[in-house]
Amino acid sequence: MTELKYSWFPGCSAGSTGIAYTQSAKYVADKIGLEMKEIDDWCCCGTSAARITDDDLMHALPARSLALSERQYPGLDVVAPCTGCYSALKGAQHWARQSEENRKHVSELIDMDYAAKADVKSLLEIMVEPDVVDLTVSRLQKTLGGMKIACYYGCTQVRPAEVCNFDDVENPTSMERLLDACGAECVEWGFKTECCGASNHVVKPKAARKAVERIFRNAKACGAEAIVTSCPLCWLNLDMREQQINSEMGTDYHLPVYYFTELLAMAMGATPDEAGLGYHFEPAAQLAQDRIVADTKTEEVTR
């Protein structure tokens, strides 16, 4: 098994709206021996705002942090937990690798040499490696207890295919494999990669709420009792809007929205607060506590 050591790009949401993701990810990382070295002086990746503003800005912002990582942690690949950050960093890396002209141009923009040799990976991409899945299962104190889960990847976890080269763009299954191995029951549904409308909530709030409602409606119709994601923007948009949608549309959705790392942390022995469940808008602790329980099989595996 390769050494689990990576350069860590936390992203802007890590200490704010995505703090539950950061907290649970670090808990899991500690349990499985995943070492993540934070890039010193990293900057905002620019995400979609830079993408619609200027091509040079879109490439320069993530390339700067990637170049710093190459200087500080030579030979280490970069892990970006936020899928928005992952998309931006992966896109800049892909563009720089297309030609020496591109690489030199972005190096001039950031006034640093960017070699574009280290790979960029999402946290999910690391966690679903077969050896890491086996290691994760070996660290469980409890199972996910057959919790019926709708795995939600969002727009950028697997797209575009030529850049990400990770899982199927229409029907990804990597998160399901990980959570199934930990005792969950992942449902089949068709909204795994549908947009939640997060970027439209300011300019087109009705359209965005409609997108969120469709996701909850379809997850519930497919028998899910929770939605699990790897994207801080999706998590915030879904979790924050659920009660609002119930009030405005007369629906009755009460599906907790979890990060996949929160469930893994709970199964590894974390309390709800340690796993980050106290940061949710829709109450999430009770379902997790009810479903995530020790059983004979888990006790034998972890003994």
Where are these regions (language model features)?
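Iron-sulfur cluster-binding electron-transfer modules in prokaryotic oxidoreductases
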Residues: 1-303
